[in-house]
Curated annotation (Swiss-Prot):
A zinc finger (C3H1-type) spans 44-68, 81-106. It holds the Pfam family zf-CCCH_2. Residues 135-147 have a biased composition (Pro residues). Residues 28-40 have a biased composition (Basic and acidic residues). Keywords: Metal-binding, Repeat, Zinc, Zinc-finger. This is Putative zinc finger protein 132L. It comes from the Viruses. One of its GO terms (molecular function) is zinc ion binding. SUPFAM superfamilies: CCCH zinc finger (SSF90229). The keyword Endoplasmic reticulum does not apply. The keyword Zinc applies.
């Protein structure tokens, strides 16, 4: 008979086995005031009478004492009864609304199809299809997007003043080259400063009756209407 050697075990505290030398700080201890607050929060409702009744001296007793009321029982939530089959005792059934089965086809609950309105097996035009589940209506179409705004394109054109009043009694003098005015500056911030520059060009153009405009027709009308003491109706333009 072979004797088996018995292994000897040394008794070690369990804390030494799970101790981590890398932890430099220990978990914070709770103060006694915090422990009392936690114990009070753990007591939700007292639902049993204390056997010591008035002689009980514990302030944190979890049982009811004389003068304390029993907590009210929570009311069960009313669950919606979904009837999926017709009652086979429709004519003889006396349960009425409490019957778990339907007494009319309108009471039968049909679960919704997981594919929703995208189901390809649903019927069309109020005709039954292969799918026996209910299908919601498709969402309404999104409103059409507004048309893009038309950008005002700048045009380069020349106009000639054919009937322009004289300036200070002098006849207009024709120059070799006509000044060029750019009216696309109306949307910029320094409008007043540039307006004075364009105004001087307009006065210069009056001398030779011809001017080249770089901008839109609407901008040209605005610049003439903005000038004080000027009436655009007295100008005649040939484009």
């Amino acid at each position: 008979m072979v004797k088996q050697r018995k292994t000897k075990y040394t008794s070690l505290p369990l804390s030494s086995l799970f101790e981590d030398a890398s932890l430099s700080t220990k978990s914070p201890k709770r103060e006694p005031s915090q422990e009392k607050e936690i114990k009070k929060e753990e007591i939700i409702k007292k639902n049993k009478p204390c056997k010591y009744e008035e002689e009980c001296k514990r302030s944190d007793c979890v049982f009811l004492h004389p003068g304390e009321k029993m907590p009210e029982k929570p009311k069960p939530k009313e669950t919606e009864r979904r009837k999926t089959r017709m009652c086979k005792y429709v004519k003889k059934c006396n349960k009425g609304k409490n019957c778990p089965f339907a007494h009319d086809e309108s009471e039968i609950y049909i679960p919704e199809c997981r594919y929703g309105y995208k189901c390809k097996k649903q019927g069309k035009d109020n005709e039954p299809g292969e799918c026996k589940f209910s299908h919601p209506p498709p969402p309404p179409p999104s409103p059409p997007s507004p048309p893009p705004k038309e950008e005002i394109k700048e045009e380069i054109f020349e106009f000639e003043i054919t009937n322009f009043p004289t300036m200070n009694g002098e006849e207009p003098v024709a120059l070799e080259s006509s000044p060029t005015m750019d009216f696309s500056y109306l949307a910029e911030e320094d409008f007043l400063q540039k307006f004075e520059e364009k105004k001087s060009l307009i006065e210069e153009s009056e001398k030779h009756r011809k001017c080249t405009i770089n901008g839109s027709i609407d901008d040209m009308m605005k610049i003439f209407e903005t000038m004080e003491g000027q009436d655009i109706s007295q100008y005649y333009f040939n484009f």
